[in-house]
Amino acid sequence: METTTLFPINKEVNVSAFYFKNSRSNLRSYPKQIEMDGTLVSFADGLGYLVRKGAQIVQLFDMSDGNNTYRLRHAGNEWTLIGMKAVA
């Protein structure tokens, strides 16, 4: 099984669109499109999860545009593109 390394970016991005999923009567939002350095990236699929860092809880999202996977962090009102990797 081949693994692809996450290429670190660590840059603040603007989430310009969201989509919503209703799972077990719990409505959750996911980033649908981000703007990074004037370029728009639209996502086809992804998953979100919570990570506890000390007393702080951070949302992470692994989103795919079909060619690349983007890891996003949502903390407070800030969205950060942690990194990306090519889809294997």
Where are these regions (language model features)?
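N- and C-terminal low-complexity/disordered segments
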Residues: 1-88
